[in-house]
Regions:
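Asparagine-centered strand-capping/turn motif at beta-strand->loop junctions
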Residues: 87-93
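C-terminal motif of bacterial Sec signal peptides marking the signal peptidase cleavage site
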Residues: 17-20
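N-terminal, intrinsically disordered, polar/charged segments of Gram-positive cell-envelope systems
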Residues: 7, 24-70
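Short, solvent-exposed, Trp/other aromatic-anchored flexible loops in extracytoplasmic proteins
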Residues: 81, 110-164, 173-175
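Short acidic, flexible loop segments centered on an aromatic residue
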Residues: 93-111
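Bacterial N-terminal signal peptides that target proteins for export
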Residues: 1-9
Length: 175
């Protein structure tokens, strides 16, 4: 008798625990003909054409949208690197990252053997800031590039690590 009471009590307790851990959300009708919207992480705003400019074209607006403006401010060169200076204006209430992807200099791709393009800047919410795209001279030399002539890459504006907000293809001619 005690065994049966114990088994029934454990069974009831198990059922109560399963009900308590169940999904509290209302179910959705999957037979609806409505097509779900694509999230912005899957569909970033992409410039339809490549933004082309030379290193002498100071104050070139590269991108303007989603509360963010990216502007090219000039080229600096020292013994260690070429630096393409950028200015950022973020009028949104979100913090973004700007990074380069699929980059190449003089048609030589950026890869693990030679990191010829470096860019990772943070844009604080409702702020202006400065950043840069750097081309380290030792990495350029390792890739057999004596002088950069053309930089091609995508500048990507990223929110919350995974959501690409904008993808801007650029082509910069060094003069």
């Amino acid at each position: 008798m005690k065994k049966k009471v114990f088994t029934v009590a454990v069974s009831l307790l198990t059922i109560l625990l399963l009900v308590a851990c169940g999904n509290n959300k209302k179910s959705t009708d999957t037979s609806s003909s409505e097509i779900p919207k694509t999230s912005s992480s899957q569909k970033a705003e992409q410039s339809s054409k490549t933004i082309e400019f030379s290193t002498t074209a100071i104050d070139t607006v590269i991108y303007e949208g989603k509360g963010v403006t990216l502007t090219y401010k000039g080229l600096e060169k020292d013994d260690y690197e070429y630096t393409l200076k950028l200015a950022y204006k973020n009028t949104s209430n979100k913090e973004y990252e700007v990074q380069t992807r699929n980059g190449k200099v003089n048609n030589i791709s950026n890869n693990d053997n030679h990191k010829i393009i470096i860019c990772s800047d943070t844009l604080k919410a409702s702020a202006t800031s400065e950043g840069s795209i750097k081309l380290p001279i030792n990495a350029l030399e390792a890739a057999s590039i004596t002088k950069p002539k053309v930089l091609e890459c995508n500048l990507e504006v990223i929110y919350d690590i995974t959501e690409t907000v904008a993808k801007i293809p650029i082509k910069v001619t060094f003069e």
